[in-house]
A protein has these predicted regions:
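Active-site/acyl-donor-binding loops of N-acyltransferases
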Residues: 239-249, 265-295, 299-351
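Structured-RNA-binding interfaces characteristic of tRNA pseudouridine synthases
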Residues: 1-269, 275
């Protein structure tokens, strides 16, 4: 059995999202039909990222399994012949049979477009959010500066989210502006991160629309982030303005991962995970952490290390060493005493 990875582009206007559901036509449904027509096999595709009804994609990633011996590159053209015109395969390649698009470290980039003018443009209506009020893009840029880095983004998450935790890392966010021939301006919010919560980008965009139009000050963004309360943020902006631009998968681990914000600061040493040893470990140093975040922080990092191949995680707390004790449970991981610079070791109790 072979596993084929697809880079998929689609106009989401006519679809009820990417994931198969009982009511409504979806991107996944059309891809499944095309794969079955081509291969004669029922092999459901798995998307790396799910998109909602009306949301578009330039570079979503999907995989499917097949016994067909066609060269991987030819699947691009063969599937496109069997897909509607608003869905296109941009590239296809073979990947290891155990490669799973949702279990990889990656960088996702979304773009959100806002058409700002007195009169809507019919040519932009399906791919941008229309805004009548004049928007101050400089205030919008000021507002997003606090969002970069690792934070708890619970305030920008809809209630229907099934996420285990609401901490994400934003690598970069920029707001661009360009003139439109028909008049007005097209504002593009480009945001890259380790992952995004349900409706996260659209709620950030909805909050920025309020800031740009003067309904609330730019300083509100940081207050919203700190409060961690969805009620404080703006509305969910329209789906038509959102496009999943790309998903880039990490080829190798970084030597160190660190994070610093008002609530926590840590450094995670991953060099041993890259060394290819039979028994590999990661080394976590906690410099400071608010009590409300401590349990979740350690649980999340222990699980991240395990997923990246660590047999255990050695940990030290330089702020309050007494917070760690033998037998403490962090999800599936239990602390036991260790020797040396890192006095504690966490191992998965499920194995």
């Amino acid at each position: 059995m072979r596993r084929i990875r697809l880079t998929v582009s689609y106009d989401g206007t006519a679809y009820c999202g990417s994931q198969v559901q009982p009511n409504g036509v979806t991107i996944e449904e059309k891809l499944n039909e095309a794969v079955e027509k081509l291969t004669g096999e029922k092999s459901p595709v798995i998307f790396a990222s799910r998109t909602d009804s009306g949301v578009h994609a330039l570079g979503n990633i999907a995989v499917f399994d097949t016994e067909m011996r066609m060269t991987a590159e030819k699947f691009t053209f063969a599937l496109n012949q069997r897909l509607p015109e608003d869905i296109r395969i941009r590239a296809s390649e073979e990947v290891p049979a155990d490669w799973h698009p949702r279990k990889q470290n990656c960088r996702k980039t979304y773009i959100y477009r806002i058409y700002n003018h007195k009169i809507p443009d019919p040519l932009l209506r399906l791919y941008s959010q229309f805004c009548y009020y004049d928007l101050d893009t400089e205030k919008m840029r000021q507002a997003v500066r606090c969002l970069t880095g690792e934070h708890d983004f619970n305030c920008f998450c809809s209630a229907r989210s099934q996420a285990e935790n609401t901490v994400r890392t934003i690598y970069g966010i920029e707001i661009l502006e360009e003139a439109v021939p028909a008049g007005g301006k097209l504002i593009t919010i480009r945001i890259s991160g380790s992952g995004f919560l349900y409706n996260m980008v659209r709620i950030i965009a909805g909050t920025l629309l309020q800031i740009g139009s003067g309904i609330r000050p730019a300083e509100d963004m940081e207050r919203i982030l700190r409060a961690r309360d969805r009620k404080n943020a703006g509305p969910v902006a329209g789906a038509c303005g959102l496009t999943l631009a790309s998903i880039e998968f990490q080829k190798e681990l970084e030597d160190e991962v660190s994070a610093e914000n008002e609530d926590w600061s840590y450094v995670l040493d991953q060099r041993e995970l890259k060394a290819g040893k039979t028994v590999r470990a990661a080394y976590l140093t906690v410099y400071r952490c608010a009590e409300r975040d401590y349990q979740e922080l350690l649980t999340r990092l222990f699980h991240q290390n395990y997923r990246n191949g660590a047999a255990c995680t050695y940990v030290r707390d330089l702020e309050k060493p007494g917070r760690l004790a033998p037998g403490q449970q962090y999800g599936f991981y239990m602390l036991e005493a260790a020797e040396g610079e890192y006095p504690w070791r966490a191992e998965d109790q499920g194995n």
